[in-house]
Amino acid sequence: MFFYKYLTHFKDPMKKVLVLLLLIPLLAFAWEPTKPITVLIGNQPGSGNEVGFRAISAIVQKNNPNANFIIELRPGGDSVIALNMLYDAKPDGYTIAVPSYMSTFVTNDIWQKNQKKFRYDSFTNIGGLGKSPLCIVANPTSKINTVPELIDYVQHTTRPVTFAAGGGAHRMTFEYFMFKAHGNKDLVKVSMFPGPLQAVTATASDAGFEFGIMPVAIAKPLIDAGKVKLIGVTGERKVAHYPKVEPIRVNGSYIDVFAAWALLLPPGTPSDIVAWYTRNFIPALDSPEITQYYKDNLIFIDHKETTPTGFANGIEKLRATWMPLSQRVDLLKE
């Protein structure tokens, strides 16, 4: 399809013939999907990884009618089960994954180190697909409404307090918040859920989870419905949709952690397959449909991380920042 559109630019028949002769070697080796593609996601239904990929892949399928993506949810081990499957998959373009940054590239190395088969740099990177600020939300019955109130609460509570979290980045936000706030970790605990939707649903319920941490993109429907209260967001900027809510700042420090999703292929994927995914997925991020979808759902694109090199550089910075804290909180020793 791509080459046909390219040839239509030439009106002279002889030029078309010459260009076609030059393109024959490329046509002979260019890869395109001819059967369904399995998309591994290591979360329960409703994660940002899943909903974001569904939106982007709809654009890709519109431009490539033969591309058929079958999402396979494989939760467990904070996405390790899904990524072990990707690691073992044939590098033929028919198995891909959409994992989260923090789990895959930082915390799996510490908290799931005995479960994983892969190194953080084992996979073939296409690039980042989107990011969303994380947020701290509270059950509507909680007396806490602001970040300063929450800081005081985790310092001085005299009864058990439980946070719900749905991923590695969410757990890291909890740990950093408690570390900077000098919170009482004997009484303030975090309970891990298999996905962010499950974590925010638990926070909204009467199950005893007073607070929750998850992407604001996933919490938004329950925030807007009044089922949970938005306390604060990660990063240094306000979220336009919630102008009255301040970024989380603890003892002068912002929490620079985001929910972030990437497109990865198995180790050793050939360059022609990499080229197809790059050519189709990265431009789709700037399509009018995705631009509007991301705006509506509080997701943004870090364009520096939409190339393999830029993405790899971003991951190294992420590891340099957050590996030390994850090593302080070794779940295998708790």
Predicted regions and their residues:
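Sec-dependent signal peptide recognition
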Residues: 15-20
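Short beta-strand->loop
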Residues: 118-129, 164, 187-192, 210, ...
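Hinge/capping helix and adjacent helix->loop/strand transition within the periplasmic-binding protein
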Residues: 33, 85-95, 109-198, 248, ...
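N-terminal secretory signal peptides that target proteins for export/translocation
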Residues: 1-14
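An extracytoplasmic/periplasmic, membrane-proximal ligand-sensing/linker region
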Residues: 34-36, 185, 272-334
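Hydrophobic h-region of N-terminal signal peptides that target proteins for export
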Residues: 23-30
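Solvent-exposed loop/turn segments at secondary-structure junctions
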Residues: 45-46, 78, 102-105, 133, ...
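N-terminal (or domain-start) structured segment
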Residues: 31-121, 167-170, 180-213, 222, ...
